[in-house]
Structure formats: C-alpha cells, structure tokens
C-alpha cells in the first residue's frame, strides 16, 4: 500500500469545514497542532525504557505524520518492532501502544488489571455525549455470556427462519431469474446481519424496523470516523471540541433517534404490565429481559445498552462472513465440498436446524477458522499482543496459503479436537482474543455465520465477475474485507431444504 497523509485520509470529511472562515480554520489547526505537541507528554513517558517504533521525527510537530505512517504500513512497522525485542512501544492511530510478543499471551490472559472494554471506552471517548454505547460496562459482557450464549439452542430455529425470509426479501425479483445477477456483497451482508441480529435481540417490532436497522449499521461507522477526528485534539480540548465536530453531532442525533424508536416499546410494556425482567422461562425472551435480569438492580440505560450490543455484534460478524464468502468464491471446489457436508449432515429432506447439527459441520468450521487466521478481526488496543504467530511458518505449514482443511484434522492425527474449533482461541490463533479477554459473543457469531452460509450455499450459485479479485483492505493493523467487491449470484436447485 502506498503511503498517504492524514489529510488524504480525512479528505472525504473536509467538506464539513467549507463554511468556516479561513482564518478560523487556520487558527483551529494551529492551536491543535501546538497543544497536541506541547501538552501531550504521555506519548514520551509511557514505559520510556522500551524500544520505540514509529516515533515522531525531531522536525515533526505532533504525531500526525507518525500516525499516517502507521495507517499506511502498520504490519511492517510491527514486524520491525519485533526485530528490536519481544516488547516495544509504537505510535498507532490511537496513541502509543505497548506491543507484546504472542508468547506472552498465556501470561496476560487472566490478568484482571487489563480490560478490553476500558481500552475501548478510552479509545472511543465514552465520557463524551454521543459515544455513550462505548462505556466500559460489565453488564453487556454478562448479557452475552450468561443469556445470549446459553439461549443459542432456542435461537437457532427462529434465526434460520428469519434468514430465509430475509434472503427472499433481499433478492426480491431475483428468485425466478436463473441468470447471473451482480451484488455488492459487503453492503448486503451487513444489512442481512443487522436484520437478523436486531430481530434476535429486540424481537419483531423493533427488529424489523428499517429505521432501527439503519442506526445499527450507521452508528458504528459514524462513531469510528468521529472518534478518529476527535483524537486529533489533545484530551483537554475534546470535551469542548466535540460540540463543533459535525460527525459528533451526527452521533448524538442517532442516539436521539434510537430513543424515539425504543422508548415507546418500553412504555407499552409498562402499560401492559409486562416487566422487563420477565421470568427466565417466559415464552418471550429478548435483550430487554436479559439486561434487566443481569442488571440485578444496577442502574443502566436500556437504549444505550441495546446500541452497545449492536456495536459488538454486527460489523465484526458481517466483515467475517463477507471475507469467508470471498474466500469461497475463489475456490469453487471448496463450495462443492461444503455443500456435500451440509447434505451429509442434514439428509435429503426438510429438516430443522439445531445447534448440535451446526456443530457437526466440521469442514465449515475449519474454513471459518482458516479465513479468520488469514484475516483476523483486530489486534487489540493500549496493550496488545501481536497475532503474527497466525502467519508464522514455524507454527503453520505454508501460512500464506489458504488451506480450508487446516483445522479439519489436527496435523499428525485423524481426529478433530476442541482446540481446532473456530470458537477455540489459543496463543497461535488470537482471532477472538484469549482467556478472560476472549470475545464472549463468538458462539453467537459462529452460529449466525454458519446458518447464513448454509442457506446461501444451498440456495445460490456464487462466483466472482470476470477479472475480479477481492482484496483485503489494510489500514494500520486493521484488516477488512473488500468494501466494494461484487459477486454474481444465481438461484440453484437445493438438495435439502433447511428451516
């Protein structure tokens, strides 16, 4: 990837400043640069005895250039850091980060003093209005771990049924057409995952509301842009600067819209004397009930809590599923092998999906884990353990090659063990984190992805347009599925009908 400047990165958003007087723009930039350079000693003081990678040059004012270098070539900079030692610090887009070799993963996996949620709250300015869903809150972790994961067996069938309905509506006018049709994959997968997730968490009324789904899809993206712009200001200026940044105002507007949608549902429940903390065996369970049960008297904001669940559930899952489909369309023989596995597991008849049957899709599980190995979701923040072991030839044979059978049978054995499963993390495969810092929603994500994959592979032929090859987008240490790549879909006869 060629080098680019911070100005180029933010170019799409500069039109927000077009109505400001030129003198005001210059003054704002000058004050920001000077204060950022003069009043941000934390960059220099953080564990100063460690090797420093990508520090600012002596002639650079502030850390804008250093951050731009990281965004343009983050992976190479991290690799250069490990040439200096197993622990080093470097300037990333969100400040100075201590980077650890993956051999330390087991040592820090249980350290209570480290918190991903708190680093997320710091990164995304959770104390500033508009960024409230990024607040460090154990309640969300408890809901995912003790409610959502434990209810998966009961969620699978309705999730499968909703997938069928969503696919039919998504491809309306296409069902009877046997010709190839072009689709922008990432956009449609994001909308599909948002729809299914919102229905699971919030039920039919809100879950099928297009306005709510738009908020779920847009809020996270808008928050990333707003958070990045706000990081350009030193901390002492952020509580004032956010009031004048258009992207921050947009976040507050989206939160107001979320309240407009959710508050009437809460009021209706109250009028109907339906308590939020419905009994665990009640016929209807949703995230409102789970939040109230897990809160156990703690004060929380139901609207912010619902958006917090959406932030952690939608974009990472849709990015993962998009990348898996891109990996598959480049390997038609693998699509055929997966279809054979699905038919073998489910038979040749109408059949209901269950969590147990999904767990028998071991080749699909291996494909998911290999896709994640090649393009993990993230590397963490503040203090992070590098995940470069995921591409280490000393650990994985031909690590640069996509091998869908890599985790299907453990090397040297004829068995498939727990460590090979998609949801099982290890220091050698940090796609979901590790230990107490592991992603609690990985079981729901794996279930949702497998259900969608089963239906898409059975119902549609899928391939790339001629001379097309999706690229993994690299910005800093983050890897993302191609945002613009398209696929061709065509309706096919399906060997088994899943419900």
Identify the function of each model-found stretch.
Residues 2-140:
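N-terminal membrane-proximal hinge/A-helix region immediately C-terminal to the signal-anchor transmembrane segment
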Residues 67-79, 348-384, 394, 419-426, ...:
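Conserved cytochrome P450 K-helix E-x-x-R motif and the immediately C-terminal K′/meander segment
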Residues 157-321:
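Cytochrome P450 heme-thiolate monooxygenase catalytic core
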Residues 334, 424-425, 430, 436, ...:
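Cytochrome P450 heme-binding "Cys pocket" and the immediately downstream C-terminal segment
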């Amino acid at each position: 990837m060629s080098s680019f400047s911070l100005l180029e990165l933010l170019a799409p958003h500069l039109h927000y400043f077009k109505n400001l007087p030129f003198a005001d723009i210059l003054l704002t930039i000058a004050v920001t640069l000077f204060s950022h350079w003069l009043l941000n000693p934390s960059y220099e003081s953080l564990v100063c005895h460690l090797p420093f990678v990508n520090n600012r040059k002596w002639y650079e004012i502030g850390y804008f250039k250093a951050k731009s270098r990281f965004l343009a070539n983050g992976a190479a900079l991290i690799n250069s850091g490990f040439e200096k030692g197993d622990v080093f610090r470097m300037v990333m887009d969100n400040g100075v980060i201590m980077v650890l070799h993956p051999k330390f993963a087991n040592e820090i996996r249980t350290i209570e003093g480290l918190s991903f949620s708190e680093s997320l709250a710091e990164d995304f300015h959770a104390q500033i209005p508009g960024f409230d869903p990024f607040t460090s809150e154990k309640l969300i972790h408890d809901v995912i771990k003790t409610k959502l994961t434990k209810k998966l067996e009961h969620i699978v069938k309705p999730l499968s049924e909703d997938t069928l309905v969503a696919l039919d509506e998504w491809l309306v006018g296409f069902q009877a057409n046997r010709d190839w049709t072009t689709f922008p994959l990432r956009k449609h997968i994001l909308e599909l995952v948002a729809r299914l997730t919102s229905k699971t968490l919030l039920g039919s009324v809100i879950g099928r509301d297009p306005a709510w789904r738009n908020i779920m899809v847009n809020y996270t993206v808008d928050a990333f842009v707003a958070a990045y712009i706000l990081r350009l200001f030193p901390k002492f200026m952020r509580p004032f600067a956010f009031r004048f940044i258009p992207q921050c105002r947009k976040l507050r507007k989206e939160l107001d819209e979320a309240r407009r949608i959710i508050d009437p549902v809460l009021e209706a429940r109250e009028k109907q004397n339906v308590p939020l903390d419905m009994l665990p065996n009640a016929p209807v369970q949703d995230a409102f009930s789970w939040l109230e049960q897990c809160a156990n008297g703690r004060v929380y904001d139901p609207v912010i809590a619902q958006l917090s669940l959406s932030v952690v559930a939608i974009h990472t899952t849709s990015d993962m599923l998009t990348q898996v489909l891109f990996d598959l369309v480049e390997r038609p023989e693998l699509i055929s092998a997966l279809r054979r596995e699905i038919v073998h597991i489910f038979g040749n008849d109408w059949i209901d999906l269950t969590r147990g049957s999904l767990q028998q899709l071991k080749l699909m599980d291996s494909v998911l884990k290999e896709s994640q190995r090649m393009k993990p979701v993230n590397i963490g923040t503040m203090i992070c353990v590098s995940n470069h072991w995921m591409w280490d030839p000393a650990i994985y044979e031909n690590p640069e090659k996509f091998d869908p059978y890599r985790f299907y049978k453990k090397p040297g054995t004829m068995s498939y063990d727990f460590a090979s499963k998609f949801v099982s993390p290890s220091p050698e495969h940090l796609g979901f984190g590790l230990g107490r810092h592991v992603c609690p929603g990985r079981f729901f994500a794996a279930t949702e992805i497998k259900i969608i994959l089963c239906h898409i592979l059975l119902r549609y032929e899928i391939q790339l347009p001629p001379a097309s090859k999706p690229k993994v987008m690299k910005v800093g240490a983050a890897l993302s599925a191609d945002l613009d790549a398209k696929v061709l879909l065509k309706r096919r006869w399906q060997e088994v009908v899943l419900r």
